[in-house]
Protein backbone atom coordinates (compact mmCIF):
# COMPACT_ATOMS: atom_id res chain seq x y z
CA UNK A 1 0.00 0.00 0.00
CA UNK A 2 2.82 2.42 0.88
CA UNK A 3 4.46 1.77 -2.49
CA UNK A 4 1.20 2.60 -4.27
CA UNK A 5 0.87 5.89 -2.37
CA UNK A 6 4.47 6.79 -3.18
CA UNK A 7 3.95 6.04 -6.87
CA UNK A 8 0.74 8.08 -6.89
CA UNK A 9 2.32 11.10 -5.18
CA UNK A 10 5.61 11.30 -7.14
CA UNK A 11 4.01 12.37 -10.46
CA UNK A 12 2.05 15.10 -8.65
CA UNK A 13 5.23 16.40 -7.00
CA UNK A 14 7.05 16.32 -10.34
CA UNK A 15 4.27 18.36 -11.98
CA UNK A 16 4.39 20.89 -9.13
CA UNK A 17 8.16 21.14 -9.55
CA UNK A 18 7.77 21.54 -13.32
CA UNK A 19 5.19 24.31 -12.79
CA UNK A 20 7.53 26.11 -10.38
CA UNK A 21 10.40 25.86 -12.87
CA UNK A 22 8.14 27.14 -15.66
CA UNK A 23 7.34 30.22 -13.55
CA UNK A 24 11.08 30.78 -12.93
CA UNK A 25 12.05 30.57 -16.61
CA UNK A 26 9.08 32.73 -17.63
CA UNK A 27 10.50 35.43 -15.33
CA UNK A 28 13.89 34.95 -17.02
CA UNK A 29 12.23 35.54 -20.41
CA UNK A 30 10.80 38.80 -19.03
CA UNK A 31 14.27 39.87 -17.81
CA UNK A 32 15.76 38.93 -21.17
CA UNK A 33 13.32 41.03 -23.22
CA UNK A 34 13.72 43.97 -20.81
CA UNK A 35 17.53 43.77 -21.10
CA UNK A 36 17.37 43.61 -24.90
CA UNK A 37 15.09 46.65 -25.00
CA UNK A 38 17.55 48.54 -22.76
CA UNK A 39 20.37 47.40 -25.06
CA UNK A 40 22.08 46.01 -21.96
CA UNK A 41 24.46 43.40 -23.36
CA UNK A 42 25.86 42.57 -19.92
CA UNK A 43 22.41 41.80 -18.47
CA UNK A 44 21.55 39.69 -21.51
CA UNK A 45 24.83 37.78 -21.27
CA UNK A 46 24.31 37.17 -17.55
CA UNK A 47 21.20 35.12 -18.41
CA UNK A 48 23.43 32.54 -20.16
CA UNK A 49 25.23 29.54 -18.64
CA UNK A 50 29.05 29.55 -18.92
CA UNK A 51 28.88 26.71 -21.47
CA UNK A 52 25.89 28.01 -23.42
CA UNK A 53 25.44 27.76 -27.17
CA UNK A 54 23.47 30.38 -29.11
CA UNK A 55 22.31 29.39 -32.59
CA UNK A 56 21.05 32.57 -34.29
CA UNK A 57 19.16 32.36 -37.55
CA UNK A 58 21.35 32.23 -40.65
CA UNK A 59 24.56 32.50 -38.61
CA UNK A 60 27.20 30.18 -37.23
CA UNK A 61 26.73 28.93 -33.65
CA UNK A 62 28.09 31.18 -30.90
CA UNK A 63 29.76 28.96 -28.31
CA UNK A 64 30.45 29.92 -24.70
CA UNK A 65 29.31 32.80 -22.53
CA UNK A 66 32.23 35.09 -23.49
CA UNK A 67 31.50 34.74 -27.22
CA UNK A 68 27.79 35.19 -26.58
CA UNK A 69 28.57 38.41 -24.69
CA UNK A 70 30.53 39.70 -27.66
CA UNK A 71 27.67 38.73 -29.99
CA UNK A 72 25.19 40.76 -27.93
CA UNK A 73 27.55 43.75 -27.56
CA UNK A 74 27.70 43.96 -31.37
CA UNK A 75 23.97 43.35 -31.74
CA UNK A 76 22.82 46.12 -29.39
CA UNK A 77 25.40 48.56 -30.83
CA UNK A 78 23.85 48.16 -34.29
CA UNK A 79 21.66 51.24 -35.00
CA UNK A 80 19.12 48.96 -36.72
CA UNK A 81 18.52 47.13 -33.43
CA UNK A 82 15.45 48.81 -31.92
CA UNK A 83 13.03 48.26 -29.05
CA UNK A 84 10.36 45.63 -29.61
CA UNK A 85 7.46 43.88 -27.97
CA UNK A 86 7.37 40.10 -27.91
CA UNK A 87 4.73 37.59 -26.92
CA UNK A 88 5.74 33.97 -26.42
CA UNK A 89 3.32 31.07 -26.65
CA UNK A 90 4.86 27.95 -25.14
CA UNK A 91 3.84 24.77 -26.91
CA UNK A 92 5.96 22.29 -24.95
CA UNK A 93 7.85 22.36 -21.67
CA UNK A 94 9.70 19.42 -20.12
CA UNK A 95 12.12 19.08 -17.23
CA UNK A 96 14.75 16.36 -17.05
CA UNK A 97 17.04 16.67 -14.05
CA UNK A 98 18.68 20.10 -14.10
CA UNK A 99 17.60 20.86 -17.69
CA UNK A 100 14.29 22.43 -18.75
CA UNK A 101 13.48 22.31 -22.46
CA UNK A 102 10.87 24.54 -24.04
CA UNK A 103 9.59 25.16 -27.54
CA UNK A 104 7.53 28.24 -28.27
CA UNK A 105 6.10 30.41 -30.99
CA UNK A 106 6.66 34.13 -30.76
CA UNK A 107 5.01 37.21 -32.19
CA UNK A 108 6.48 40.67 -31.98
CA UNK A 109 6.32 44.23 -33.19
CA UNK A 110 9.06 46.80 -33.67
CA UNK A 111 9.14 50.24 -35.24
CA UNK A 112 11.95 51.18 -37.58
CA UNK A 113 12.01 54.37 -39.68
CA UNK A 114 8.45 55.17 -38.57
CA UNK A 115 7.26 51.85 -39.96
CA UNK A 116 5.72 49.19 -37.73
CA UNK A 117 7.11 45.75 -38.47
CA UNK A 118 5.42 42.55 -37.28
CA UNK A 119 7.43 39.37 -36.93
CA UNK A 120 6.61 35.77 -36.08
CA UNK A 121 8.81 32.78 -35.36
CA UNK A 122 9.68 29.78 -33.26
CA UNK A 123 12.35 28.91 -30.75
CA UNK A 124 13.88 26.03 -28.87
CA UNK A 125 15.53 26.82 -25.58
CA UNK A 126 17.18 24.65 -22.97
CA UNK A 127 17.56 26.16 -19.50
CA UNK A 128 20.11 24.78 -17.03
CA UNK A 129 19.72 24.96 -13.28
CA UNK A 130 22.67 26.69 -11.66
CA UNK A 131 24.30 25.86 -8.31
CA UNK A 132 22.50 28.84 -6.75
CA UNK A 133 19.12 27.45 -7.90
CA UNK A 134 18.60 29.98 -10.71
CA UNK A 135 17.98 28.96 -14.33
CA UNK A 136 20.18 30.14 -17.17
CA UNK A 137 20.06 29.67 -20.92
CA UNK A 138 22.07 26.60 -21.91
CA UNK A 139 21.05 26.23 -25.57
CA UNK A 140 19.04 28.71 -27.63
CA UNK A 141 17.92 28.44 -31.23
CA UNK A 142 15.36 30.56 -33.04
CA UNK A 143 14.06 31.37 -36.48
CA UNK A 144 11.56 33.78 -37.95
CA UNK A 145 8.76 32.47 -40.10
CA UNK A 146 8.14 34.68 -43.15
CA UNK A 147 4.67 36.19 -43.32
CA UNK A 148 2.35 34.74 -45.92
CA UNK A 149 1.57 37.14 -48.72
Predicted regions and their residues:
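A beta-strand edge to alpha-helix "cap/lid" segment located at domain peripheries
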Residues: 13-46, 53-149
Amino acid sequence: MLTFLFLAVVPVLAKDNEATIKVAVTERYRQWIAAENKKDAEAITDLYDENAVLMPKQEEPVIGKAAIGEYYRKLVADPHFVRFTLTLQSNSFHVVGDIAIETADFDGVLTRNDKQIHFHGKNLIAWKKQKDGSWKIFRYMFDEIPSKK
